[in-house]
Swiss-Prot record:
CDD domains: HAM1 (cd00515). It comes from Syntrophobacter fumaroxidans (strain DSM 10017 / MPOB). Keywords: Hydrolase, Magnesium, Metal-binding, Nucleotide metabolism, Nucleotide-binding. Mg(2+) binds at D72. This is dITP/XTP pyrophosphatase. Its EC number is 3.6.1.66. NCBIfam families: PRK14822.1, RdgB/HAM1 family non-canonical purine NTP pyrophosphatase. The lineage of its organism: Bacteria, Pseudomonadati, Thermodesulfobacteriota, Syntrophobacteria, Syntrophobacterales. The keyword GTP-binding does not apply. GO terms for biological process: nucleotide metabolic process; purine nucleoside triphosphate catabolic process. GO terms for cellular component: cytosol. Homodimer. Coiled coil: none annotated. Substrate binds at T10, R11, N12, K13, G14, K15, S73, F153, G154, Y155, D156, K176, H181, R182.
Amino acid sequence: MEHAILVIATRNKGKSREIGKYLEHFPVEVRDLNDFGPIPEVVEDGATFEENAYKKALLTARVLGLPALADDSGLEVAALGGAPGIHSARYAGPDASDAANNEKLLAALSGVEDRAARFCCVLSLAVPSGPALTYEAFCEGTILTAPRGDNGFGYDPLFHYAPAGKTFAEMSLDEKAKVSHRGRALLELQREFDQVLKWLHARTADENLRRGVGHDMCVTGEDPRGTEPKME
């Protein structure tokens, strides 16, 4: 099978390298937005992580004409009705720092006994015509009353993962990757990537035929996991 090109919808080289490590043994060329010129910013106004991830993946795929993978993630706290949720990065305001977001979270949970929380990550892999595959994963934990650890970012210093007895900010990158929400979603993608590549090649063939470009691959619109892809 010929190599496919997959664009990671980020300019964060660390994130693109992390994703690329999961796919390095497959016939796919992983690129990110640094390999291309400027593209429009995505307005993340979706009501769910899935909607926002799909918007980012689809815009990137349509602008570049290549399959694109995007993620959206955040923290959901049970006692706060799932907040900060999709607003995790801007919980304390549009340009809030991690420290400000953490301070607001601690204030919101002041005196609250139920501190159960979970991180959620949704990956969306879209092709230019609209269909996409979606992967979702969670990591359950609790919110501490004070930060611990100097690694990580975001809410990592407050998120305690009981099986490890550590916050995410106390873990090494390798430790965190094995148990985190993003790591679990990427592992799910990795396990199915042979079938995902077949789906991508079939979709490419379909789109080439629509444009009148010859291609010798079979055309199919089936999701390799047995369910219909998400449509725009």
